[in-house]
Amino acid sequence: MNAIRYPFITEKAMMLMDENKLQFVVDTRANKTQVENDVVKMYGFTVKSVCTMTTMKGLKKALVTFNETDAAHEIATRIGLV
């Protein structure tokens, strides 16, 4: 099961990139370990922490913090967000 569905792009999420964090919408059945493993497998950067939250609309979001400096900007550039 691929836990990550798509990146969550808002103005607040873009500001979090300066703190080396990215937000993703994930499968509602996915746990933090699955999200971490998928991020490492897809993008090749080590993950410092994963925080998950469920919105009132029923979406599950994951806030991923990276160990490497500027990893969030590098991933955002690869995806085409920046």
Swiss-Prot record:
Similarity field: Belongs to the universal ribosomal protein uL23 family.
Molecular-function GO terms, alphabetical: rRNA binding; structural constituent of ribosome
UniProt xrefs under PANTHER family: 60S RIBOSOMAL PROTEIN L23A
GO biological process: translation
Full protein name: Large ribosomal subunit protein uL23
UniProt KW NAD keyword: no
Top-level taxon in the UniProt lineage: Archaea
Positions of disulphide bridges: none
Keywords recorded for this protein, A-Z: Ribonucleoprotein, Ribosomal protein, RNA-binding, rRNA-binding
InterPro entries: Nucleotide-bd_a/b_plait_sf (IPR012677), Ribosomal_uL23-like (IPR013025), Ribosomal_uL23/eL15/eS24_sf (IPR012678)
SUPFAM superfamilies, per database record: Ribosomal proteins S24e, L23 and L15e
Pfam families given in the database record: Ribosomal_L23 (PF00276)
